[in-house]
């Protein structure tokens, strides 16, 4: 019994430390993936707002192809006037332009660009970036489906790595204790 307690005392701090490190690695990679999901939309929203501020027409900054956001990972753009009314959109949800949260537009009106995870319905999650322009707002977005698949893979790999490290450290400690007992005997 004393040997088991000794093994637990040696292994438990290692188990806790490795759990913390695996969690830190997972969170770092997950956040990197999620923040990277905004990169194309930042450029799209900023470029469209610049063009609109320079006098371009609303239709010229919105892609002609419609994107059914429930089924596609393609990026899309929605342009709103200053009251939040949709002026043009390349996004549809079941054939209609989805409603975007007015609170986000209010925030952007006061603070500037915002990056928001938007879920217009269950199972449809979008990485969106909203940029103000002189007469309203430009929102660029795309599906998080692929990013979330990668996050799940990283979560699984982190869990497997943690279990492997726990098993390896436990085996080393047990073997070390057994060898030490034989030498003492």
Features from the language model and the residues they span:
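Alpha-helical transmembrane segments of membrane proteins, especially the N-terminal anchoring helices
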Residues: 1-40, 131-185
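Extracytoplasmic ligand-binding sensor domains of the Cache superfamily
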Residues: 42, 46, 51, 61-123
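Short, well-ordered helical secondary-structure segments
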Residues: 14-16, 20, 28, 64-67, ...
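Broad hydrophobic/π-residue packing in well-ordered secondary structure
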Residues: 7-10, 26, 75-77, 88-89, ...
